[in-house]
């Protein structure tokens, strides 16, 4: 189907996510024509790609502004997957850094305040030396150096509770915009109709 100038072509891409699609392109400036095969993606996939790009940009900003002294992690949600990504990053590619920026902005919550408190409250008690060379600090599975946490108005539920615990325990400074105080605890219940799930505040 030809797409006329000014025509909305989005409807042509509906319901073909993941399907290889032939697109014929015409360049009026020089009269050239060519074909490209593309694979449309869903809105969800697009959002994921945009999020990953945003995180990379923030990490690059922190590296540039700190001269490579600080690392950067964003906690997308207070859930296992986000924790594993953060854990791998801080003890992996950022292990050499002097400090870490923990970004919790736009986090919708979950339950991870205790895990984050434990992870970032490490205190060095020895340095392991192997054959005269320093190998690692202990504890080796917690962050023993400086950290700072960023918040914003879009933090919700446990993304309010986590910065509160971080500040209450004196782990580091909390900076950014105020969190609206939305910390809640919810019990998820199913009744006779198992397709219905109710979040009951406790």
PLM regions: where:
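Cleft-lining beta-strand/loop regions that shape enzyme active-site pockets
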Residues: 2-197
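Short, intrinsically disordered, charge-balanced linker/junction segments flanking boundaries
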Residues: 200-202
């Amino acid at each position: 189907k030809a797409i006329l100038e000014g025509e909305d072509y989005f409807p042509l891409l509906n319901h073909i996510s993941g399907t290889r699609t032939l697109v014929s392109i015409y360049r009026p400036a020089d009269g050239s024509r060519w074909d490209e095969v593309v694979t449309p993606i869903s809105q969800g996939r697009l959002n994921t790609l945009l999020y990953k790009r945003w995180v990379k940009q923030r990490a690059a900003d922190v590296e540039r502004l700190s001269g490579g002294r600080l690392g950067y992690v964003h906690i997308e949600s207070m859930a296992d997957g986000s924790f594993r990504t953060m854990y791998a990053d801080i003890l992996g590619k950022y292990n050499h850094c002097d400090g870490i920026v923990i970004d919790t902005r736009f986090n919708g919550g979950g339950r991870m305040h205790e895990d984050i408190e434990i992870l970032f409250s490490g205190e060095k008690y020895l340095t392991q030396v192997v054959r005269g060379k320093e190998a690692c600090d202990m504890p080796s599975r917690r962050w023993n150096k400086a950290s700072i946490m960023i918040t914003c108005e879009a933090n919700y539920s446990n993304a309010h509770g986590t910065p509160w615990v971080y500040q209450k325990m004196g782990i580091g400074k909390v900076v950014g915009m105020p969190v609206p105080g939305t910390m809640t605890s919810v019990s998820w219940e199913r009744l006779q109709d198992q397709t219905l799930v109710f979040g009951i505040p406790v």
